[in-house]
Amino acid sequence: LVYKSRVFTDTYSKDTIVVNNAEQVIQGGTGYGPGGKDLPYEIEHIRPDYFLYPRFLGTAYGFLSRGCPRNCGFCIVSGKEGRRSVKVADLSEFWRGEDEIKLLDPNLLACPDHEALLGQLAASRALVDFTQGLDIRLTNPDNIALLNRVRTKAVHFAWDNPEEDLTEHFKRFVAHTAIRSDRNRRVYVLTNYGSTHEQDLYRVNTLRALGYDPYVMIYERPTAPKITRHLQRWVNN
C-alpha cells in the first residue's frame, strides 16, 4: 500500500510520477482537489523516514499545529483543516536531534498551545525555519520573547490584504525581536488577488523600509499582468 500525496494542481506542477510495484495506491492532498479522507491516525503520526531523501538528512519536517481561523479566500487551510488552530503533535514526533527543523504550521500563533510548543522548539536548540507565515497580528511582547529563545534560521510573515495596514504590527515585532538580519525576517506579499500595482509596490517598499525582506507571491500566475510578473522577478531576485 502506497500513499501518494500532491500539493499543487496542474497550474504549477504536472502529476507525472508513477508508482510501481504497489498493490494499492491511495492518492490524496490538495493537488487532487478539495475533500478527501483523512489519513489513518497511525499514518498521520508516524515518524517521517528521512532516509528516503538523503540530501535532506539533518533536517526535520513537520507540523505542531493545524488549522487557521482566518478563512482567507485564496487559501484552502481553513476549509481543509478547520477554522481553529489546534495542537496535533509534540516536537518529538518528527524531530530526534536533527540540526534543523522546517516547521510547516499554517498559523502557529493562533494555537492556544503555541507558548508550550515554542518552548519545545527553544529546548531543542535546533535551527528553526518557520516556513509558513506566522500571523503578525497575533504577535505581542510575550510571544516575541518566546520566539527570541528559539534558534531561528528564518521567520516568515504575510501581508496578503492591501486594505489592511499592518505597519504598526511589523514595527512592534522589529522593536522586540532578537532576529537582527532583515534577510531572516521575511514577508510573503500576495499579488494578483484584487490588489493594484500601486498597492503591491506600497507593501514591498514599506516592508523594506521597516527592515523586512518581502517575497512576492502571485495568485494564479498565468492570469497575472506582465507588470506583476516583473515586480515578482525584481523583488524576489
Q: What is the role of each PLM region?
A:
Residues 1-59:
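Glycine-rich beta-alpha loop elements in corrinoid/cobalamin-binding modules
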Residues 3-7, 76-173, 182-193, 213-217:
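Core AdoMet radical
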Residues 10-13, 33-37, 70-71, 81-83, ...:
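Short catalytic/ligand-binding loop motif for oxyanion handling, primarily in non-cytosolic enzymes
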Residues 13-22, 118-119, 144-147, 167-177, ...:
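Generic structural signal for well-ordered alpha-helices
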Residues 20-25, 181-183, 212:
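A short helix->loop->beta-strand "cap" motif at the edges of active sites that frequently abuts
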Residues 48-85, 98-105:
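N-terminal pre-triad scaffold of radical SAM enzymes
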Residues 112, 192-197, 215-237:
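Flexible glycine/acidic-rich beta-alpha junction loops that bind and position SAM and/or redox cofactors
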Residues 193-210:
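Catalytic cores of alpha/beta
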